[in-house]
């Protein structure tokens, strides 16, 4: 199963402040919406609660709480490992979409990392881990918006 991480991160590594994304960059989320359409997303519960359920996606939500879902598109798991075991039988590709603890747990297992680097230093308390050695940047495109950003793809190997 291919594992892709996808995140928007400030120049100083921030991805969140509490449950919020501490910026709004016009157009930046369109790529996320397009790439994750009809895909499985692996997220933590706080991220799922803050983003809400987007249409035409399936969610594997990792939580310490014992939650049962009646929605066939939302499945809860007690650990990242149990989510991966389930997803390995359900799909050939997942998008890991946060939060900080989930990224940290899976960054070394990722095959591809999709980053939108927001060209601003932002205050926050949730961070994206450094891209590990062994990843190589394979694509970069800059965008002008209300806050400029650069979309990057990093691939293992």
UniProtKB/Swiss-Prot annotation:
Keywords linked to the UniProt accession: Antibiotic resistance, Methotrexate resistance, NADP, One-carbon metabolism, Oxidoreductase, Plasmid, Trimethoprim resistance
Task: Check the record and name the CDD domains matching this protein.
Answer: DHFR (cd00209)
Q: What is its EC number?
A: 1.5.1.3
Query: Where does the sequence pass through the membrane?
Result: none
Q: Which reaction does it catalyse?
A: (6S)-5,6,7,8-tetrahydrofolate + NADP(+) = 7,8-dihydrofolate + NADPH + H(+)
Q: What's an example GO BP annotation here?
A: folic acid metabolic process
The keyword Oxidoreductase is annotated on this UniProt entry: yes
Per the record, the pathway is:
Cofactor biosynthesis; tetrahydrofolate biosynthesis; 5,6,7,8-tetrahydrofolate from 7,8-dihydrofolate: step 1/1
Can you give the residue ranges of the DHFR domain? 2-156
Recorded GO molecular functions are: dihydrofolate reductase activity; NADP binding
Name a GO CC annotation attached to this entry: cytosol
Identify the InterPro entries for this entry.
DHFR, DHFR-like_dom_sf, DHFR_CS, DHFR_dom
- One Pfam annotation reads DHFR_1
This chain's function reads:
Key enzyme in folate metabolism. Catalyzes an essential reaction for de novo glycine and purine synthesis, and for DNA precursor synthesis.
Family statement: Belongs to the dihydrofolate reductase family.
Quaternary structure per UniProt? Homodimer.
Matching entries from NCBIfam families are given as: trim_DfrA1_like (NF000330)
PANTHER family this protein is in?
DIHYDROFOLATE REDUCTASE
Q: What protein am I looking at?
A: Dihydrofolate reductase type 6
Source organism of this protein record: Proteus mirabilis
